[in-house]
Amino acid sequence: MDHLKRQDEKVFAAIEAELGRQRSKIELIASENFVSEAVMEAQGSVLTNKYAEGYPGKRYYGGCEHVDVVEDIARDRVKEIFGAEHVNVQPHSGAQANMAVYFTILEQGDTVLGMNLSHGGHLTHGSPVNFSGVQYNFVEYGVDADSHRINYDDVLAKAKEHKPKLIVAGASAYPRVIDFKRFREIADEVGAYLMVDMAHIAGLVAAGLHPNPVPHAHFVTTTTHKTLRGPRGGMILCEEQFAKQIDKSIFPGIQGGPLMHVIAAKAVAFGEALQDDFKTYAQNIINNANRLAEGLQKEGLTLVSGGTDNHLILIDVRNLEITGKVAEHVLDEVGITVNKNTIPFETASPFVTSGVRIGTAAVTSRGFSLEEMDEIASLIAYTLKNHENEAALEEARKRVEALTSKFPMYPNL
Protein backbone atom coordinates (compact mmCIF):
# COMPACT_ATOMS: atom_id res chain seq x y z
CA MET A 1 0.00 0.00 0.00
CA ASP A 2 2.82 2.37 -0.85
CA HIS A 3 0.59 4.78 -2.81
CA LEU A 4 -1.93 5.00 0.03
CA LYS A 5 0.79 5.58 2.59
CA ARG A 6 2.16 8.50 0.58
CA GLN A 7 -1.24 9.97 -0.26
CA ASP A 8 -3.13 9.65 3.02
CA GLU A 9 -1.19 8.78 6.15
CA LYS A 10 -4.26 8.92 8.41
CA VAL A 11 -6.29 6.36 6.45
CA PHE A 12 -3.18 4.22 5.97
CA ALA A 13 -2.54 4.26 9.72
CA ALA A 14 -6.12 3.22 10.48
CA ILE A 15 -5.91 0.31 8.02
CA GLU A 16 -2.56 -0.77 9.43
CA ALA A 17 -4.02 -0.65 12.94
CA GLU A 18 -6.93 -2.84 11.82
CA LEU A 19 -4.51 -5.31 10.26
CA GLY A 20 -2.70 -5.39 13.58
CA ARG A 21 -5.96 -6.04 15.42
CA GLN A 22 -6.85 -8.93 13.12
CA ARG A 23 -3.38 -10.41 13.53
CA SER A 24 -3.22 -10.10 17.31
CA LYS A 25 -6.75 -11.04 18.35
CA ILE A 26 -8.79 -14.23 18.15
CA GLU A 27 -11.71 -13.50 15.80
CA LEU A 28 -14.84 -15.31 16.96
CA ILE A 29 -17.61 -13.09 15.57
CA ALA A 30 -19.79 -15.62 13.74
CA SER A 31 -20.51 -13.34 10.79
CA GLU A 32 -16.87 -12.53 10.05
CA ASN A 33 -14.16 -14.33 8.12
CA PHE A 34 -10.78 -13.75 6.48
CA VAL A 35 -10.83 -13.57 2.68
CA SER A 36 -7.94 -14.69 0.50
CA GLU A 37 -5.47 -12.21 -0.91
CA ALA A 38 -6.85 -13.05 -4.37
CA VAL A 39 -10.29 -11.85 -3.28
CA MET A 40 -8.77 -8.64 -1.92
CA GLU A 41 -6.83 -8.04 -5.13
CA ALA A 42 -10.00 -8.38 -7.20
CA GLN A 43 -11.87 -5.99 -4.94
CA GLY A 44 -9.04 -3.47 -5.15
CA SER A 45 -8.86 -3.65 -8.96
CA VAL A 46 -9.59 -1.12 -11.72
CA LEU A 47 -13.14 -2.47 -11.91
CA THR A 48 -13.95 0.04 -9.18
CA ASN A 49 -13.82 2.68 -11.95
CA LYS A 50 -16.57 1.15 -14.10
CA TYR A 51 -20.25 2.05 -14.09
CA ALA A 52 -22.41 -0.81 -15.38
CA GLU A 53 -26.10 -0.16 -14.76
CA GLY A 54 -28.16 -3.07 -16.05
CA TYR A 55 -27.12 -6.67 -16.63
CA PRO A 56 -24.65 -8.47 -18.93
CA GLY A 57 -25.61 -7.89 -22.55
CA LYS A 58 -28.09 -5.18 -21.59
CA ARG A 59 -26.25 -2.26 -20.00
CA TYR A 60 -27.06 1.43 -19.97
CA TYR A 61 -23.39 2.35 -20.37
CA GLY A 62 -20.79 1.55 -23.01
CA GLY A 63 -17.51 -0.17 -22.35
CA CYS A 64 -18.98 -3.01 -20.31
CA GLU A 65 -17.64 -5.93 -22.33
CA HIS A 66 -15.11 -6.96 -19.67
CA VAL A 67 -17.28 -6.46 -16.60
CA ASP A 68 -19.96 -8.50 -18.40
CA VAL A 69 -17.52 -11.41 -18.45
CA VAL A 70 -16.85 -11.02 -14.73
CA GLU A 71 -20.54 -10.92 -13.79
CA ASP A 72 -21.31 -13.94 -15.96
CA ILE A 73 -18.48 -15.87 -14.30
CA ALA A 74 -19.90 -15.03 -10.87
CA ARG A 75 -23.45 -16.05 -11.80
CA ASP A 76 -22.39 -19.29 -13.50
CA ARG A 77 -20.28 -20.33 -10.52
CA VAL A 78 -23.16 -19.77 -8.10
CA LYS A 79 -25.43 -21.88 -10.29
CA GLU A 80 -22.83 -24.65 -10.26
CA ILE A 81 -22.35 -24.49 -6.49
CA PHE A 82 -25.99 -24.42 -5.42
CA GLY A 83 -27.92 -25.75 -8.42
CA ALA A 84 -29.91 -22.54 -8.80
CA GLU A 85 -31.97 -21.72 -11.89
CA HIS A 86 -31.36 -17.96 -11.69
CA VAL A 87 -28.84 -15.86 -9.79
CA ASN A 88 -28.45 -12.14 -9.17
CA VAL A 89 -25.05 -11.20 -7.73
CA GLN A 90 -25.60 -7.43 -7.67
CA PRO A 91 -27.08 -6.87 -4.16
CA HIS A 92 -24.73 -4.76 -2.08
CA SER A 93 -25.71 -6.65 1.08
CA GLY A 94 -27.87 -9.43 2.43
CA ALA A 95 -30.36 -6.86 3.66
CA GLN A 96 -30.80 -5.49 0.14
CA ALA A 97 -31.19 -9.02 -1.21
CA ASN A 98 -34.02 -9.59 1.27
CA MET A 99 -35.57 -6.23 0.40
CA ALA A 100 -35.58 -7.11 -3.29
CA VAL A 101 -37.45 -10.36 -2.65
CA TYR A 102 -40.02 -8.56 -0.52
CA PHE A 103 -40.50 -5.91 -3.19
CA THR A 104 -40.93 -8.63 -5.81
CA ILE A 105 -43.87 -10.47 -4.22
CA LEU A 106 -45.31 -8.34 -1.40
CA GLU A 107 -47.51 -5.30 -1.14
CA GLN A 108 -47.31 -2.94 1.81
CA GLY A 109 -49.17 -4.45 4.76
CA ASP A 110 -48.99 -8.06 3.55
CA THR A 111 -48.58 -10.70 6.25
CA VAL A 112 -45.23 -12.48 6.54
CA LEU A 113 -44.15 -15.22 8.97
CA GLY A 114 -40.58 -14.83 10.18
CA MET A 115 -38.33 -15.88 13.06
CA ASN A 116 -38.30 -13.81 16.24
CA LEU A 117 -35.07 -11.79 16.44
CA SER A 118 -34.24 -12.84 20.00
CA HIS A 119 -34.85 -16.48 19.05
CA GLY A 120 -32.22 -16.27 16.31
CA GLY A 121 -33.85 -14.36 13.44
CA HIS A 122 -32.55 -11.22 11.73
CA LEU A 123 -33.48 -7.55 11.66
CA THR A 124 -34.79 -7.94 8.11
CA HIS A 125 -37.09 -10.78 9.16
CA GLY A 126 -39.62 -8.39 10.63
CA SER A 127 -37.97 -6.40 13.41
CA PRO A 128 -40.10 -3.32 14.19
CA VAL A 129 -37.01 -1.09 13.91
CA ASN A 130 -36.29 -2.36 10.38
CA PHE A 131 -38.04 -1.52 7.10
CA SER A 132 -39.39 -5.08 7.01
CA GLY A 133 -41.32 -4.64 10.23
CA VAL A 134 -42.50 -1.19 9.21
CA GLN A 135 -43.68 -2.02 5.69
CA TYR A 136 -45.18 -5.46 6.32
CA ASN A 137 -47.26 -7.26 8.92
CA PHE A 138 -44.76 -9.75 10.32
CA VAL A 139 -45.93 -12.55 12.59
CA GLU A 140 -43.21 -14.27 14.60
CA TYR A 141 -42.36 -17.90 15.17
CA GLY A 142 -39.61 -19.04 17.51
CA VAL A 143 -37.92 -21.91 19.27
CA ASP A 144 -39.20 -24.34 21.86
CA ALA A 145 -38.67 -23.17 25.45
CA ASP A 146 -36.95 -26.39 26.50
CA SER A 147 -34.98 -27.53 23.45
CA HIS A 148 -34.33 -24.08 21.94
CA ARG A 149 -35.00 -25.63 18.53
CA ILE A 150 -37.54 -24.50 15.94
CA ASN A 151 -40.97 -25.95 16.71
CA TYR A 152 -42.27 -26.80 13.25
CA ASP A 153 -45.72 -27.70 14.56
CA ASP A 154 -45.93 -24.18 15.99
CA VAL A 155 -44.78 -22.73 12.66
CA LEU A 156 -47.55 -24.65 10.90
CA ALA A 157 -50.15 -23.56 13.45
CA LYS A 158 -49.17 -19.90 13.06
CA ALA A 159 -49.16 -20.24 9.27
CA LYS A 160 -52.67 -21.69 9.30
CA GLU A 161 -53.89 -18.99 11.67
CA HIS A 162 -52.38 -15.94 9.95
CA LYS A 163 -52.26 -17.08 6.28
CA PRO A 164 -48.99 -15.32 5.39
CA LYS A 165 -48.16 -14.48 1.80
CA LEU A 166 -44.51 -15.27 2.54
CA ILE A 167 -42.69 -17.45 5.06
CA VAL A 168 -39.08 -16.54 5.87
CA ALA A 169 -36.71 -19.28 7.06
CA GLY A 170 -33.11 -18.76 8.08
CA ALA A 171 -31.41 -17.09 11.01
CA SER A 172 -28.53 -15.02 12.33
CA ALA A 173 -28.12 -16.82 15.66
CA TYR A 174 -29.52 -20.35 15.35
CA PRO A 175 -26.93 -23.10 15.92
CA ARG A 176 -28.97 -26.01 14.58
CA VAL A 177 -29.82 -27.49 11.17
CA ILE A 178 -32.95 -25.96 9.61
CA ASP A 179 -35.42 -28.32 7.91
CA PHE A 180 -36.09 -26.47 4.66
CA LYS A 181 -38.16 -29.33 3.27
CA ARG A 182 -40.53 -29.01 6.22
CA PHE A 183 -40.75 -25.25 5.74
CA ARG A 184 -41.72 -25.75 2.08
CA GLU A 185 -44.41 -28.25 3.08
CA ILE A 186 -45.82 -25.69 5.51
CA ALA A 187 -45.68 -22.95 2.88
CA ASP A 188 -47.45 -25.13 0.33
CA GLU A 189 -50.14 -26.08 2.85
CA VAL A 190 -51.13 -22.44 3.35
CA GLY A 191 -50.37 -21.21 -0.18
CA ALA A 192 -47.38 -19.06 0.81
CA TYR A 193 -44.09 -18.32 -0.89
CA LEU A 194 -40.94 -19.53 0.90
CA MET A 195 -37.80 -17.42 1.17
CA VAL A 196 -34.70 -18.84 2.84
CA ASP A 197 -32.01 -16.51 4.15
CA MET A 198 -28.93 -18.75 4.28
CA ALA A 199 -26.44 -15.95 4.95
CA HIS A 200 -24.73 -17.67 7.87
CA ILE A 201 -24.60 -21.19 6.48
CA ALA A 202 -24.01 -20.60 2.75
CA GLY A 203 -20.45 -21.91 2.90
CA LEU A 204 -21.57 -25.06 4.67
CA VAL A 205 -24.32 -25.55 2.08
CA ALA A 206 -21.79 -25.00 -0.71
CA ALA A 207 -19.66 -27.79 0.73
CA GLY A 208 -22.62 -30.16 1.05
CA LEU A 209 -22.47 -30.11 4.85
CA HIS A 210 -25.87 -28.50 5.46
CA PRO A 211 -29.13 -29.19 3.61
CA ASN A 212 -29.42 -27.05 0.48
CA PRO A 213 -32.48 -24.76 0.54
CA VAL A 214 -32.47 -24.15 -3.22
CA PRO A 215 -34.58 -27.21 -4.18
CA HIS A 216 -37.21 -26.22 -1.60
CA ALA A 217 -37.45 -22.41 -1.64
CA HIS A 218 -38.95 -20.05 -4.19
CA PHE A 219 -36.21 -17.57 -3.22
CA VAL A 220 -32.88 -17.96 -1.44
CA THR A 221 -30.89 -14.96 -0.25
CA THR A 222 -27.44 -14.84 1.26
CA THR A 223 -24.48 -12.70 2.04
CA THR A 224 -21.26 -13.56 0.26
CA HIS A 225 -18.98 -13.28 3.28
CA LYS A 226 -19.43 -15.26 6.54
CA THR A 227 -18.87 -19.01 5.92
CA LEU A 228 -18.73 -18.50 2.13
CA ARG A 229 -15.53 -16.48 2.72
CA GLY A 230 -16.04 -13.87 0.04
CA PRO A 231 -16.23 -10.06 0.09
CA ARG A 232 -19.00 -8.29 1.96
CA GLY A 233 -22.07 -8.36 -0.27
CA GLY A 234 -25.26 -10.22 -1.10
CA MET A 235 -26.97 -12.28 -3.79
CA ILE A 236 -30.31 -13.85 -4.66
CA LEU A 237 -31.02 -17.33 -6.03
CA CYS A 238 -34.49 -18.06 -7.34
CA GLU A 239 -36.67 -20.14 -9.61
CA GLU A 240 -36.55 -19.11 -13.27
CA GLN A 241 -40.19 -17.97 -13.16
CA PHE A 242 -39.16 -15.07 -10.87
CA ALA A 243 -35.93 -14.12 -12.68
CA LYS A 244 -37.13 -11.00 -14.50
CA GLN A 245 -39.02 -9.72 -11.46
CA ILE A 246 -36.05 -10.20 -9.13
CA ASP A 247 -33.63 -8.52 -11.53
CA LYS A 248 -36.02 -5.59 -11.93
CA SER A 249 -36.38 -5.28 -8.14
CA ILE A 250 -32.61 -4.93 -7.79
CA PHE A 251 -32.12 -2.63 -10.79
CA PRO A 252 -33.73 -0.21 -11.25
CA GLY A 253 -35.82 -1.02 -8.16
CA ILE A 254 -33.53 -0.44 -5.19
CA GLN A 255 -30.01 -0.03 -6.62
CA GLY A 256 -28.27 1.85 -9.37
CA GLY A 257 -24.86 0.83 -10.66
CA PRO A 258 -23.50 -2.49 -9.36
CA LEU A 259 -20.14 -2.56 -7.60
CA MET A 260 -18.21 -4.41 -10.28
CA HIS A 261 -15.01 -4.66 -8.24
CA VAL A 262 -16.99 -6.39 -5.49
CA ILE A 263 -18.69 -8.69 -8.02
CA ALA A 264 -15.22 -9.63 -9.28
CA ALA A 265 -14.20 -10.47 -5.73
CA LYS A 266 -17.40 -12.50 -5.35
CA ALA A 267 -16.53 -14.42 -8.52
CA VAL A 268 -13.09 -15.26 -7.14
CA ALA A 269 -14.56 -16.46 -3.84
CA PHE A 270 -17.13 -18.59 -5.67
CA GLY A 271 -14.29 -20.15 -7.64
CA GLU A 272 -12.53 -20.95 -4.38
CA ALA A 273 -15.74 -22.52 -3.03
CA LEU A 274 -15.77 -24.94 -5.97
CA GLN A 275 -12.39 -26.38 -5.00
CA ASP A 276 -11.99 -29.59 -3.01
CA ASP A 277 -10.04 -27.85 -0.27
CA PHE A 278 -13.05 -25.64 0.46
CA LYS A 279 -15.01 -28.75 1.44
CA THR A 280 -12.20 -29.63 3.82
CA TYR A 281 -12.28 -26.10 5.19
CA ALA A 282 -16.05 -26.22 5.77
CA GLN A 283 -15.79 -29.58 7.51
CA ASN A 284 -13.09 -28.13 9.75
CA ILE A 285 -15.41 -25.23 10.63
CA ILE A 286 -17.99 -27.69 11.91
CA ASN A 287 -15.43 -29.90 13.65
CA ASN A 288 -13.96 -26.87 15.40
CA ALA A 289 -17.39 -25.60 16.44
CA ASN A 290 -18.31 -28.95 17.94
CA ARG A 291 -15.01 -29.20 19.80
CA LEU A 292 -15.34 -25.62 21.07
CA ALA A 293 -18.90 -26.27 22.24
CA GLU A 294 -17.81 -29.40 24.08
CA GLY A 295 -14.98 -27.50 25.74
CA LEU A 296 -17.22 -24.66 26.86
CA GLN A 297 -19.69 -27.09 28.37
CA LYS A 298 -16.90 -28.92 30.21
CA GLU A 299 -15.98 -25.54 31.70
CA GLY A 300 -19.53 -25.19 33.01
CA LEU A 301 -20.85 -22.68 30.48
CA THR A 302 -24.44 -22.91 29.26
CA LEU A 303 -25.06 -23.17 25.51
CA VAL A 304 -28.39 -22.34 23.88
CA SER A 305 -29.84 -25.58 22.45
CA GLY A 306 -27.05 -27.51 24.18
CA GLY A 307 -24.56 -27.34 21.33
CA THR A 308 -24.26 -26.72 17.59
CA ASP A 309 -24.72 -28.31 14.17
CA ASN A 310 -22.97 -25.54 12.24
CA HIS A 311 -20.35 -22.84 12.78
CA LEU A 312 -22.24 -20.92 15.43
CA ILE A 313 -22.45 -21.18 19.23
CA LEU A 314 -24.66 -19.07 21.49
CA ILE A 315 -23.53 -18.83 25.12
CA ASP A 316 -26.04 -17.98 27.86
CA VAL A 317 -23.94 -16.08 30.43
CA ARG A 318 -26.61 -15.58 33.08
CA ASN A 319 -25.27 -18.36 35.31
CA LEU A 320 -22.01 -16.40 35.52
CA GLU A 321 -23.98 -13.43 36.86
CA ILE A 322 -22.80 -11.15 34.07
CA THR A 323 -24.42 -9.71 30.95
CA GLY A 324 -23.58 -10.21 27.31
CA LYS A 325 -22.33 -6.64 27.22
CA VAL A 326 -19.88 -7.27 30.05
CA ALA A 327 -18.78 -10.57 28.50
CA GLU A 328 -18.10 -8.95 25.12
CA HIS A 329 -16.09 -6.17 26.75
CA VAL A 330 -13.92 -8.31 28.99
CA LEU A 331 -13.20 -10.85 26.24
CA ASP A 332 -12.16 -8.02 23.93
CA GLU A 333 -9.88 -6.71 26.68
CA VAL A 334 -7.90 -9.95 26.60
CA GLY A 335 -7.91 -10.23 22.79
CA ILE A 336 -10.94 -12.37 21.98
CA THR A 337 -13.47 -10.68 19.69
CA VAL A 338 -17.12 -11.72 20.07
CA ASN A 339 -20.49 -10.00 20.02
CA LYS A 340 -23.14 -9.74 22.70
CA ASN A 341 -26.39 -11.33 21.53
CA THR A 342 -29.93 -11.83 22.66
CA ILE A 343 -30.99 -15.35 23.58
CA PRO A 344 -34.41 -17.03 23.28
CA PHE A 345 -36.96 -15.57 25.70
CA GLU A 346 -34.58 -12.68 26.38
CA THR A 347 -35.42 -10.35 29.27
CA ALA A 348 -32.51 -7.91 28.93
CA SER A 349 -32.20 -4.98 26.53
CA PRO A 350 -30.63 -5.67 23.11
CA PHE A 351 -27.91 -3.22 24.17
CA VAL A 352 -27.16 -5.40 27.21
CA THR A 353 -28.32 -8.98 26.39
CA SER A 354 -27.91 -12.25 28.25
CA GLY A 355 -25.78 -13.99 25.66
CA VAL A 356 -22.66 -14.03 23.53
CA ARG A 357 -22.54 -15.30 19.94
CA ILE A 358 -19.37 -16.91 18.64
CA GLY A 359 -18.39 -18.75 15.46
CA THR A 360 -15.46 -20.70 14.05
CA ALA A 361 -15.29 -19.59 10.40
CA ALA A 362 -12.53 -17.01 10.84
CA VAL A 363 -10.31 -18.97 13.21
CA THR A 364 -10.59 -21.99 10.91
CA SER A 365 -9.46 -19.84 7.97
CA ARG A 366 -6.50 -18.84 10.11
CA GLY A 367 -5.53 -22.48 10.57
CA PHE A 368 -6.78 -23.17 14.09
CA SER A 369 -7.74 -26.79 14.71
CA LEU A 370 -9.10 -28.94 17.54
CA GLU A 371 -6.21 -28.33 19.92
CA GLU A 372 -6.69 -24.57 19.60
CA MET A 373 -10.42 -24.96 20.25
CA ASP A 374 -9.61 -26.54 23.61
CA GLU A 375 -7.43 -23.58 24.50
CA ILE A 376 -10.03 -21.04 23.33
CA ALA A 377 -12.75 -22.74 25.40
CA SER A 378 -10.47 -22.60 28.42
CA LEU A 379 -9.61 -18.95 27.74
CA ILE A 380 -13.24 -17.87 27.37
CA ALA A 381 -14.31 -19.61 30.57
CA TYR A 382 -11.28 -18.40 32.53
CA THR A 383 -11.80 -14.81 31.41
CA LEU A 384 -15.53 -14.70 32.11
CA LYS A 385 -15.18 -16.36 35.51
CA ASN A 386 -12.42 -13.91 36.47
CA HIS A 387 -13.76 -10.82 34.73
CA GLU A 388 -12.92 -8.53 37.68
CA ASN A 389 -9.48 -10.02 38.41
CA GLU A 390 -6.84 -7.96 36.61
CA ALA A 391 -4.06 -10.47 37.25
CA ALA A 392 -6.14 -13.24 35.69
CA LEU A 393 -6.99 -11.03 32.72
CA GLU A 394 -3.32 -10.27 32.16
CA GLU A 395 -2.59 -13.99 32.15
CA ALA A 396 -5.37 -14.49 29.59
CA ARG A 397 -3.86 -11.77 27.38
CA LYS A 398 -0.52 -13.57 27.38
CA ARG A 399 -2.20 -16.86 26.46
CA VAL A 400 -4.02 -15.17 23.57
CA GLU A 401 -0.76 -13.64 22.35
CA ALA A 402 0.97 -17.02 22.53
CA LEU A 403 -1.82 -18.58 20.48
CA THR A 404 -2.10 -15.93 17.77
CA SER A 405 1.67 -15.74 17.31
CA LYS A 406 1.63 -19.35 16.07
CA PHE A 407 -0.71 -18.46 13.21
CA PRO A 408 0.54 -15.36 11.33
CA MET A 409 -2.10 -13.47 9.35
CA TYR A 410 -1.56 -12.01 5.86
CA PRO A 411 2.27 -12.13 6.00
CA ASN A 412 2.54 -10.46 2.58
CA LEU A 413 0.61 -7.34 3.57
From Swiss-Prot:
Its cofactor is pyridoxal 5'-phosphate. GO terms for molecular function: glycine hydroxymethyltransferase activity; pyridoxal phosphate binding. InterPro entries: PyrdxlP-dep_Trfase (IPR015424), PyrdxlP-dep_Trfase_major (IPR015421), PyrdxlP-dep_Trfase_small (IPR015422), Ser_HO-MeTrfase (IPR001085), Ser_HO-MeTrfase-like (IPR049943), Ser_HO-MeTrfase_PLP_BS (IPR019798), SHMT-like_dom (IPR039429). Its EC number is 2.1.2.1. GO terms for biological process: glycine biosynthetic process from serine; tetrahydrofolate interconversion. The modification N6-(pyridoxal phosphate)lysine is found at residue 226. The record marks 225 as: Plays an important role in substrate specificity. It catalyses: (6R)-5,10-methylene-5,6,7,8-tetrahydrofolate + glycine + H2O = (6S)-5,6,7,8-tetrahydrofolate + L-serine. Keywords: Amino-acid biosynthesis, Cytoplasm, One-carbon metabolism, Pyridoxal phosphate, Transferase. The keyword Calcium does not apply. (6S)-5,6,7,8-tetrahydrofolate binds at residues 117, 121-123, 239, 349-351. It comes from the Bacteria. It is an enzyme of class 2 (transferase). The lineage of its organism: Bacteria, Bacillati, Bacillota, Bacilli, Bacillales. This is Serine hydroxymethyltransferase. It is found in: Cytoplasm. Belongs to the SHMT family. Catalyzes the reversible interconversion of serine and glycine with tetrahydrofolate (THF) serving as the one-carbon carrier. This reaction serves as the major source of one-carbon groups required for the biosynthesis of purines, thymidylate, methionine, and other important biomolecules. Also exhibits THF-independent aldolase activity toward beta-hydroxyamino acids, producing glycine and aldehydes, via a retro-aldol mechanism. Pathway: One-carbon metabolism; tetrahydrofolate interconversion; Amino-acid biosynthesis; glycine biosynthesis; glycine from L-serine: step 1/1. GO terms for cellular component: cytosol. It comes from Bacillus cereus (strain B4264).
